[in-house]
Structures are given as C-alpha cells and as structure tokens.
Amino acid sequence: MRPAGPVPVCCRAGRLMRVFILAGEPSGDRLGGALMAGLRQLCPDVQFDGVGGPAMESEGLSSRFPMAELSIMGLVEVLPKYFHLKRRIAETAQAVLAMRPDVMITIDSPDFSLRVARLVKDASDIRTVHYVAPSVWAWRPGRADKMAKVIDHVLALLPFEPPYMERAGMECDFVGHPVVTEPEATGADIAALRTELGLGAAPVLLALPGSRRGEVERLAPVFGAALRRFLPEHPDMRVVVPVVPHVADQVAQQVAEWPGAPVLVDPRGLAPAQAAMRKRAAFAAADLALAASGTVSLELAAAGTPMVIAYKVNWLTQKIAERMVTIDTVTLVNLVSETRVVPECLGPACTPENIAARLAAVHADPAAQDAAMRLTMERLGRGGTPPGLRAAQAVLDRLPG
C-alpha cells in the first residue's frame, strides 16, 4: 500500500524521513505505536525521536524521558506538577528544533503537546500534526482556533470531528478508532477466564472505576455503594473488576469493601498479549457493565456488553465544566450512534441510588443497546483499513510533495 497522492520528498529512495513523535499517556502510546508501524510500512527509511511508552518503544523509539511523567488529568491535578512539566516542554521543543524533522506528530495530551508545538512553531516552520482531535464538540469550542495557530493537520478518531477542525483552518482526516482493531474474545477465551476466576455459569457485572488514581479515589466508593443497593436483588451475580497495573493495588484496596466478593482481573506479571486477551474475555463474559466515562464505553460496545456510565470529578473541575459543556451526553457510544441509549450518571447525579436504578433498568432490557453498539463499531471503521495505517497514509498524503 502506498500513499494515494504524490510520494513526498522525504519518502523517496535514498532519503531518510525524520519524525519527532510525542505521546503522554498509555492510550496515546498505543496510537503512536500503530502509527509508527504504518509509517515504516509506507516509508521504510524512517527515523523516530520523541517521547512514548512501551508500544512506541517496541517500534524503535528511545523515549527521551518516562512517558508516565505526563499522565496527568484534571485542572487541579496539573497544578502541583506545573514547573516540572514546564521544564519538560522546553526540553522537548529544543529536541525537535535540533532534529529538524520532516514532521512533528503530537498525540493527545494537549496540556503538554500543544505547548511543545507552540514553541516549535514560534521558532521554525516545521510541519505539525496532532493525533486525536480535541473534543470541541463537547466543550470549549474556542480550543480549535487556538490549536490552529500551532497545528497544521489533525488526525481524528471520530467521524464527526473533521468539520470542527477544518472550520478553524486546519487540515483534518478521520482515520478510524483503534478499538475496531481489537480481536474479539473467543468462546474458549471466555470459558477459560470463567474457570480461572471461579465464576462458573454465574451472571457477571463488570465494574470499571477508572484508570487514573483520582478517578478510582472518587468513583470506587460510589460504585461500591451502588452495588450494595443493586446486588441484593441479584444474589447470583458476580462482580469482576479489570484493572490497569498502575492503579491495581489502589483498586484492590477499594473493592475489598464491596459486596459480592469482587474478583480482579490483574494484568501484572503477564505478557501484554495475554493481559489483553484476559481483558477482552472479561468484557465479553459480562452481562452488563458499570464504567467510568471515556474510551472504555467503546471497548464495551466492541464486546457487545450493555453498560451504565458514571463519572465525577473534583469540585473545582466540576464547576468549571458546568459552564463550558455544550452537549447533552458524554458517552461516545451515544455520540457516534446518534442515540442516547446508554444511561449516564454524571457529576452531581453520580450517586449510588441513581447508578443502582440504571443498572437495574439495563439488566432488565440488555438488548436495548445492541443496535447502537453495532452502528458505533461500523462508523468507527470496523472491517476496514487499520487506523494506524490510515493515519500514516494521511500524514504522508499531506506532506509537501
């Protein structure tokens, strides 16, 4: 597969393509790894520099510093790290300017990556690409205009995002969402997980209280209280809690006080492929899920698991968000499918009573979300060219010929 347009100068025989690529959290690292693989497939003579995690390092990147330093979320959480982040921003921008790459690609993490892009643009004409469009369709639409001052090209994960970016003056391509590339768990995978966890044939409720420490701290107690209301009506149901390594101990402490003898699906000590398989099997085995807001709703949709979404942030972030949010749902399944079938308990509505009531409603009619979940996967690109390769082609297609 070759770029659809003229082959860029940097991709011609005998010319090394130089790419500075920057990711700030695990989801961005996975996007970056797939994009790097796609770029190498289309343009074998490519050199990478930048910041990333295991997925990008497996594609040949030597990260300039640990990506974990950048995994910060929320207005209040960023403040204590401000001066350290400011130093890293300056260091990274200087590294880009010293490399003089054909393109700099930043992936999500806008608090960090767009500040790097601003310093780079102030001092050079280096082409900038940002992977993952900001959710200007949800809140703070003015971010697109500010972003257009430092970003030339956006790679969007969601099909409705390009017009928002283009109106601000940036080039934008929908390249598909990585969730569509995940293999489905087989019946054998699900049976093996049930046996391993001692679930037998019991119905399963999947609980996902977040992948960041602040999320777990805020959501896990509320989830536990909701389960105390919901589970007495469903005494045979087992609670399964997939975790990510960096919050596994924190989640284990929290769920120890939950009812229903919850079982953790812990990836620590496993090879990445095995850990991913167990997570997919847990999602597919579940009869319903209670999850924090975010990309996890798409993972559940990919597995066909009906869900309730719940989320709360700290008081200050909540008050700021209330003044800026412009949409009536934050769940990506609802947005992509243009439905509102996935119930939400957000902010002040994130209470045990509300969550338990919505779990009961979803459990009573689990098929109500099926059509929306299938449509979501179709619109995100399931069955088509892998998003990493589509993203790589989009980057190359828009480089100067």
From Swiss-Prot:
Belongs to the LpxB family. Condensation of UDP-2,3-diacylglucosamine and 2,3-diacylglucosamine-1-phosphate to form lipid A disaccharide, a precursor of lipid A, a phosphorylated glycolipid that anchors the lipopolysaccharide to the outer membrane of the cell. This is Lipid-A-disaccharide synthase. HAMAP family: LpxB (MF_00392). GO terms for biological process: lipid A biosynthetic process. InterPro entries: Glyco_trans_19 (IPR003835). It comes from the Bacteria. The lineage of its organism: Bacteria, Pseudomonadati, Pseudomonadota, Alphaproteobacteria, Rhodobacterales. GO terms for cellular component: membrane. One of its GO terms (molecular function) is lipid-A-disaccharide synthase activity. Keywords: Glycosyltransferase, Lipid A biosynthesis, Lipid biosynthesis, Lipid metabolism, Transferase. Pathway: Bacterial outer membrane biogenesis; LPS lipid A biosynthesis. It catalyses: a lipid X + a UDP-2-N,3-O-bis[(3R)-3-hydroxyacyl]-alpha-D-glucosamine = a lipid A disaccharide + UDP + H(+). Its EC number is 2.4.1.182. The gene is lpxB.
